[in-house]
Amino acid sequence: MRVRHPPCSRRLLAICALVSLATAALLGHILLHDFLLVPRELSGSSPVLEETHPAHQQGASRPGPRDAQAHLGRPRAVPTQCDVPPNSRFDCAPDKAITREQCDARGCCYIPAKQGLRGAQMGQPWCFFPPSYPSYKLENLSSSEMGYTATLTRTTPTFFPKDILTLRLDVMMETENRLHFTIKDPANRRYEVPLETPRVHSRAPSPLYSVEFSEEPFGVIVRRQLDGRVLLNTTVAPLFFADQFLQLSTSLPSQYITGLAEHLSPLMLSTSWTRVTLWNRDLAPTPGANLYGSHPFYLALEDGGSAHGVFLLNSNAMDVVLQPSPALSWRSTGGILDVYIFLGPEPKSVVRQYLDVVGYPFMPPYWGLGFHLCRWGYSSTAITSQVVENMTRAHFPLDVQWNDLDYMDARRDFTFNKDGFRDFPAMVRELHQGGRRYMMIVDPAISSSGPAGSYRPYDEGLRRGVFITNETSQPLIGKVWPGSTAFPDFTNPAALAWWEDMVAEFHDQVPFDGMWIDMNEPSNFIRGSEDGCPDNELENPPYVPGVVGGTLQAATICASSHQFLSTHYNLHNLYGLTEAIASHRALVKARGTRPFVISRSTFAGHGRYAGHWTGDVWSSWEQLASSVPEILQFNLLGVPLVGADVCGFLGNTSEELCVRWTQLGAFYPFMRNHNGLLNLPQEPYSFSEPAQQAMRKALTLRYALLPHLYTLFHQAHVAGETVARPLFLEFPKDSSTWTVDHQLLWGEALLITPVLQAGKAEVTGYFPLGIWYDLQTVPIEALGSLPPPPAAPREPAIHSEGQWVTLPAPLDTINVHLRAGYIIPLQGPGLTTTESRQQPMALAVALTKGGEARGELFWDDGESLEVLERGAYTQVLFLARNNTIVNELVHVTSEGAGLQLQKVTVLGVATTPQQVLSNGVPVSNFTYSPDTKVLDIPVSLLMAEQFLISWS
């Protein structure tokens, strides 16, 4: 730990010079401090998501009393202090457009930027902080059991009301790779996010980081011990801590930043004056807009392939501003500053360390990984059942049938209409008899318009006091699908019990299997409430982030409404998460098996309880392509069960688009085709025979790969791994992978290169160093009950030095490659996972040049709770070496004991084998292709018993 003292003033320059001659080390600190105030500039950036508001605008208002009063006696910035490189200027007018006079009154520099207006927004700020702008001072720094504590004091108020002039800093060195610090008001308790996080009681003995402090202006500098690289430097701009405006800025080690979801953007965010707003909102995915979820975590790549992450545990409305220096500023409207830094150093380690804090993903039931089908407009059980029958007749796998609002009585939760859905329970039981499952939409808003005694969920909720209330302590009433509605407060323990009861009572009528929780930002068709919102500081804060609609009440409920734990102002971004937790627990209680919840609104830690779909996407090629970075993004955030609506939800799809989307969707961790109310049909059987054949081929491939996908989810659940992952996660030292976001990996082994443009019969993808085998050379369909597609000639392997490769991609093909060095389990595909799980299995073995490969299979009954705690699972490792394949039985029980291994396909066998043995018994009917270097070995073995297969 080092403390950096402030640079000398001009008045003391001569004295400081003499002191510096005697204290060279101190001068070194000063010079380094001054250098870090202006981070080095890096050129190049990706397109802008959304730019910050201009600091100058014609017709801006004159300085108001707040500005004048706040800055009495403050010296103005002098020209030499304003000589700051444009890309390193931090905005002194984040709250509004201001004039030169207003900027001067704030003690800031005013230099109009050269670029002109872009609509209503601009790039670099015109009004910006000088390096001498007053900030907090570090005092009383001392060691603690966990790290350090200190007091931060400010003598000059800012231009925001209710500055907190004295703060407490706590720095906790929690683990070797995790640093945690908080900045709080020591005199008054402020809202903190009620997220369960690890509790550590002693400091890490050998951290991978060092911590330094700047005394005045206060700042925290975090370095990587290995190379001294600065990962966090908060001295680049003043710290703000007012009641409703908190700002913390830091330099960034590179421009390669990902995270800060949920937004429609490339995987790597632009650092070209990009504003990212976090305030959950019901809005069809639109560039530059705040969407359904808020995840204040970013992962930054560094030169050489190391990475680190930063998590601000804060649920208030906020902006995050990225600028080209590169640097980042957090701007929150409340709470505290609760910051975690994750040292990695590998990107996948950063993800795991983040999940150590927010929670590892839940383990989904096996059936949840099958194909799901839904549309708004299945208006009766007869129509819904006919869809299932059509899928079966056309030989399309289908595991889960869904219904949208159509099933409800007057669009009210926990009801079904007695017209089109009078035999609703019987339909669900019939699905179960066919080995399928059923899910339906459940919105959080509860109808409040009926007479007393007419609607039990509202009557009972009112009796138990479970609803969010207004300033008169009455339930806040908004409008959603059923009309006037109240909103459950899922932070209230009474609401959790009430929700469990409502779910259980409805499940007693209709034995559904999972819950689709929608509209839970929460969405509201009117602004605030039927009675409007109060005129107070929560509804009209001094700083409003760049939310669509311009106010915090837009498309949701009043910010000042009351919940059990705090105001909605503080808890809004947690609404979807708290409903997901309630629904997760309610399903466990009602069904006694593993819950399956898909939610639209999310927050950090969501993956511990539920999955996510990316909302109301358009049926367009642009949104097909943008779904790839979004799926990757949510995996990095610990929400691996994620997918976009296959073929799109808004607008009509086309046959080609739907084929390509089905091919990509076959590699979403969560795959659902969902259609809007008035659109043309987009069920797979609705298209031409060639299109159906292409879709069937993609679905068949997914079902064959389900044992591997399930194993990946197990690894995510127990070890914080990702399921779908960006290439840079596996190949961080190859900088060519860093911006690849139109391909994805499943785990370490499978590389998927989809076609994302219209009219294309080939596709170009990046292949990192290694051998990549075409998965289509592995025969899988013969294992199952579905008809095999016609074979097509393929290039069996790509030997890459790290290069872009153009691949043939006719309409019936999605390119999937198996990485050398890996073994994946396969299973015969059926029309349901119930059927597939009874089919024989196979192994695809992809050898390296040295003839080695490894893999894993995790297997259980697919839906029981606590299988790990009870030991009710089978786990098998596979190893290939020296022309031999063996399995290692890590854990074996009756679950998996009957899994039959019927075929082993070895890729990359260099020479023709003369003999193949299975447990010492010759295999006479093996086949080998000298052209493709593929060895197919028919066997009759059990996965859960030791075996040895060899060739020579």
Curated annotation (Swiss-Prot):
Proregion residues are 28-69
Q: From which residue to which does the signal peptide run? A: 1-27
Which cysteine-cysteine pairs are annotated as disulfide bonds in the entry? C82-C109, C92-C108, C103-C127, C533-C558, C647-C658
Binding positions (substrate): D404, R600, D616, H674
Glycosylated residues: list them: N140, N233, N390, N470, N652, N882, N925
EC primary class = hydrolase
Domain (P-type) ranges: 80-131
| GO CC annotation, single | lysosomal membrane
As recorded in UniProt, its EC number(s) are 3.2.1.20
Molecular function in Gene Ontology: alpha-1,4-glucosidase activity; carbohydrate binding
**Which keywords does the record carry?**
Disulfide bond, Glycoprotein, Glycosidase, Hydrolase, Lysosome, Membrane, Signal
Protein name (database record): Lysosomal alpha-glucosidase
